């Protein structure tokens, strides 16, 4: 049998095999057998050396025509098989449109994010800029720049997660302030910033403590900034978050990076200052710490403390949310319980 007869026979047999294939697996096997790299057409091409030179052109042309025909028929057969499979599925699989629909569930903002977004908008409206810093910080920026050298006893006030001797999970967002302070160009105006973010401390988790919580620290540096400016700012923050009817007071305190240092209390939400178990019968609840920036902090950042001064404050966003919404357990913030979270949808703005 010469090659022309073999091509004619392959033509007839190939079309017959393609027409018999009823699934994609069988069709792929036919494709490999006919036009694959080791298929029948390839074998014929490899035997071209036995064809007389004057017939090689015609044989090659016949092989190419047959390959094109097989590929076209194979593609058409595959399309028909896919359509048949889909038609069968549509016939067998039905949707019962009489079943009741399932209502889509909309998420809601986390209560801490509600407080965070509200405070960020509030401070931006007062001309502050919002700064985000790294959560893995250096000892230099978290402590040394903040007037806490390595031998300072106040370091024991913060149980810090150290990664190595120089790097740590930040225990406060003060590092953001230090980074901005040392780069700020005061010839272009005062520095007003807030730095929100996660902080970490080696606390045992319970109803009032967490190894991770959200903090926002603020910093204002300019000429002629006074304690009165700080007091007015803190009062505005407290009344904005907790309501205009809240009374406030400042108490002396101690923080290494401010001097003088104060803590702010607001009148108890439960008893309006009359005294109850929530406020430990004092009528007041502590909400934040603040103070006038220590001259050493300014000098560490290359700022002349004889010319510039300012104030700083730190807000625990978890604590603000606990107080504002009457939450009993700080761990509720981190359990991802939808039943707990969805009750704050009405607080979104």
UniProtKB/Swiss-Prot annotation:
Main location: cytoplasm
The protein's required cofactors: Mg(2+)
GO molecular function: ATP binding; catalytic activity, acting on a protein; magnesium ion binding; phenylalanine-tRNA ligase activity; transferase activity; tRNA binding
GO cellular component, one term: cytoplasm
Pfam families for the chain: Phe_tRNA-synt_N (PF02912), tRNA-synt_2d (PF01409)
GO BP: any one term: phenylalanyl-tRNA aminoacylation
Organism: Lactobacillus acidophilus (strain ATCC 700396 / NCK56 / N2 / NCFM)
UniProt keyword terms in alphabetical order: Aminoacyl-tRNA synthetase, ATP-binding, Cytoplasm, Ligase, Magnesium, Metal-binding, Nucleotide-binding, Protein biosynthesis
Family statement drawn from the similarity comment of this UniProt entry: Belongs to the class-II aminoacyl-tRNA synthetase family. Phe-tRNA synthetase alpha subunit type 1 subfamily.
Sites where the protein binds Mg(2+): 259
EC numbers on record: 6.1.1.20
Complex formation: Tetramer of two alpha and two beta subunits.
Originating gene: pheS
Reactions that this protein is recorded to catalyse: tRNA(Phe) + L-phenylalanine + ATP = L-phenylalanyl-tRNA(Phe) + AMP + diphosphate + H(+)
Designated name of the protein: Phenylalanine--tRNA ligase alpha subunit
Compartment(s): Cytoplasm
Keyword Aminoacyl-tRNA synthetase in record: yes
Highest classification ranks of the organism: Bacteria, Bacillati, Bacillota, Bacilli, Lactobacillales
Cofactor note: Binds 2 magnesium ions per tetramer.
Manganese keyword on record: no
First-level EC class: ligase
């Amino acid at each position: 049998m010469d090659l022309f007869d073999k091509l004619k026979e392959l033509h007839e047999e190939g079309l017959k095999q393609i027409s018999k294939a009823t699934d994609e697996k069988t069709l792929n096997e036919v494709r490999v057998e006919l036009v694959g790299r080791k298929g029948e057409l390839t074998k014929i091409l490899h035997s071209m050396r036995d064809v007389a030179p004057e017939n090689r052109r015609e044989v090659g042309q016949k092989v190419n025509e047959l390959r094109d025909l097989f590929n076209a028929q194979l593609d058409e057969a595959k399309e028909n098989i896919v359509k048949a499979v889909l038609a069968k599925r549509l016939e067998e699989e039905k949707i019962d449109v009489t079943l009741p629909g399932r209502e889509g569930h909309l998420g809601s903002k986390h209560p801490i994010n509600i407080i965070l977004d509200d405070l960020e908008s509030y401070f931006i409206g007062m001309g502050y800029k919002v700064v985000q810093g790294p959560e893995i910080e250096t000892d230099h920026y978290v402590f040394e720049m903040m007037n806490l050298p390595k031998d300072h006893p106040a370091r024991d006030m913060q149980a810090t997660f150290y990664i190595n001797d120089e790097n740590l999970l930040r225990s406060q967002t003060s590092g953001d302030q230090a980074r901005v302070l040392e780069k700020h160009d005061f010839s272009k105006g005062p520095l007003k910033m807030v730095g929100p973010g996660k902080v970490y401390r080696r606390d045992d988790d319970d109803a009032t403590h967490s190894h991770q919580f959200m903090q926002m620290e603020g910093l204002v540096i300019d000429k002629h900034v006074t304690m009165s400016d700080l007091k007015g700012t803190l009062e505005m923050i407290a009344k904005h978050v907790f309501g205009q009817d809240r009374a406030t007071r400042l108490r002396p305190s101690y923080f290494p990076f401010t001097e003088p240092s104060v803590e702010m209390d607001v009148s108890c939400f439960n008893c309006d200052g009359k005294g109850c178990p929530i406020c430990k019968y004092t009528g007041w609840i502590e909400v934040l710490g603040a103070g006038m920036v220590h001259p050493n902090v300014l000098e560490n950042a290359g700022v002349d403390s004889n010319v510039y001064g300012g104030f700083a404050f730190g807000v625990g966003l978890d604590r603000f949310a606990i107080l504002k919404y009457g939450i009993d357990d700080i761990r509720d913030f981190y359990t991802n319980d939808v039943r707990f979270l969805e009750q704050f949808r009405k607080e979104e703005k």
